[in-house]
């Protein structure tokens, strides 16, 4: 059966939920899905229940969201792709890959707890990876009777946003209850509609980098029997028409291929646009020829590099970072777009060490080439946790 064509009738916006573990991100995501499906039934607005969003098998055993779930829904104004970003500190790596895909995010804070350590870490990371707008869902508000406590929590959250240069004074803070909305309680169903109205009105229509040369980081690779190899990811910029020639850059020697098909949410597209999550079918490319961390680009537009100058913020101990300073010859992982690559740091002349909580300039030599350009962001990671975040300021080689 031929797949349905994807119709572009409304602005498309990528959003997500951030926040501390157990503050109710996934429950709220399920509530948004249900409330919109009930209020504005359409082919897009199909209710996704909690279990299907919280879907990877190891998640349920630990009661922690590990993978990133993509949920699709629409309001009368817009079409949304929503990523439920993981909340547990161990899985900040996924948070980085998820947050990099957001035009704005809903920071979920339980009214019963207020902002916690991971709430702060997510706001810090959101700023580092370039999430431009945050608004707040004060979840579990049904469980707090005291108006003063709600106002106090709201004040705390606003201060947290302002501390990372988000518009803390102006950001909408909407009191919601994901659980009560799922149960159909009218007051709290309305709160979710109010939240989505705030998202519609406060996360501007994204300006996509459509005019730049096409680039899509590879997140996943799989084989469709009889058709070939598909790479999936979010187009970072540019547009790509079916039957275009592309290069696959980074990690291995650059290779050329042709894109013979493009899909988004299981619907066929004639072309992929910046900001869209899509799958690209590659002609004559074997599954083992491509891997996560490479990028698919317009030929000649991006080159692979191993050494660069950058500036980075080293997280303090309170932010979940290192206890000890870093020195020249420190060898952490550098997380670019969708993958970790080991690199050796050289501090600038005259700098003996960098303390947690400081910002520093550095020169880095990676052990594998990465598709790189000035301004590219990275996280510095060690033993599975984020210890710093920065940007490439100059390419050396």
From Swiss-Prot:
Signal peptide: none annotated. It comes from the Bacteria. Gene3D superfamilies: P-loop containing nucleotide triphosphate hydrolases (3.40.50.300), Translation factors (2.40.30.10). Keywords: Cytoplasm, Elongation factor, GTP-binding, Hydrolase, Magnesium, Metal-binding, Nucleotide-binding, Protein biosynthesis. Residues 139-142 are annotated as: G4. Residues 84-87 are annotated as: G3. Residues 177-179 are annotated as: G5. Mg(2+) binds at residue 26. GO terms for cellular component: cytosol. Residues 10-207 form the tr-type G domain. The keyword Acetylation does not apply. It is an enzyme of class 3 (hydrolase). Its EC number is 3.6.5.3. It is found in: Cytoplasm. PANTHER family: ELONGATION FACTOR TU, MITOCHONDRIAL, ELONGATION FACTOR TU-RELATED. GTP hydrolase that promotes the GTP-dependent binding of aminoacyl-tRNA to the A-site of ribosomes during protein biosynthesis. This is Elongation factor Tu. It comes from Leifsonia xyli subsp. xyli (strain CTCB07). The gene is tuf.
């Amino acid at each position: 059966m031929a797949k349905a064509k994807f119709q572009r009738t409304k602005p498309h916006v990528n959003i997500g939920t951030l926040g501390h573990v157990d503050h109710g991100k996934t429950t709220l995501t399920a509530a948004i899905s249900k409330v919109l499906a009930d209020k504005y039934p359409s082919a897009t607005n199909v209710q996704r229940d909690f279990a299907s969003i919280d879907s990877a098998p190891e998640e349920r055993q630990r009661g922690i969201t590990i993978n990133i779930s993509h949920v699709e829904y629409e309001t009368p104004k817009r079409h949304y792709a929503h990523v439920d970003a993981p909340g547990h500190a161990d899985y900040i790596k996924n948070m980085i890959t998820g947050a990099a895909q957001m035009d704005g995010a809903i920071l979920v804070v339980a009214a019963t707890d207020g902002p916690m350590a991971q709430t702060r870490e997510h706001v810090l990371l959101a700023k580092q990876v370039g999430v431009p707008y945050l608004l707040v869902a004060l979840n579990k508000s049904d469980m707090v009777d005291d108006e003063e406590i709600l106002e106090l929590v709201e004040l705390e959250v606003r201060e947290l946003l302002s501390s990372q240069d988000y518009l803390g004074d102006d950001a909408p803070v909407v009191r919601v209850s994901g659980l009560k909305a799922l149960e159909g309680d009218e007051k709290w169903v309305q709160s979710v509609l109010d939240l989505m109205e705030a998202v519609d009105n406060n996360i501007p229509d994204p300006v996509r980098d459509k005019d730049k040369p096409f680039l899509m980081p590879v997140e996943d690779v799989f084989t469709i029997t009889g058709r070939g190899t598909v790479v999936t990811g979010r187009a970072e910029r540019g547009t790509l028409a079916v039957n275009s020639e592309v290069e696959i850059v980074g990690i291995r020697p650059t290779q050329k291929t042709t894109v013979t098909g493009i899909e988004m949410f299981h619907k066929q597209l004639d072309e992929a646009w910046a900001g869209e999550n899509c799958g690209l079918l590659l002609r004559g490319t074997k599954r083992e020829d491509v891997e996560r961390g490479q990028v698919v680009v317009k030929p000649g537009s991006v080159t692979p590099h191993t050494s660069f100058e950058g500036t980075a913020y080293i997280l303090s101990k309170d932010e979940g970072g290192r206890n000890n300073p870093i020195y020249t010859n420190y060898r952490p992982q550098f997380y670019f777009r969708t993958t970790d690559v080991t690199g050796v740091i050289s501090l600038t002349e005259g700098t003996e060490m960098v303390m947690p909580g400081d910002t520093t300039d550095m020169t880095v030599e990676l052990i594998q080439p990465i598709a790189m350009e000035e301004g590219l962001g990275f996280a510095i990671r060690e033993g599975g946790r984020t210890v710093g975040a920065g940007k490439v300021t100059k390419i050396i080689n």
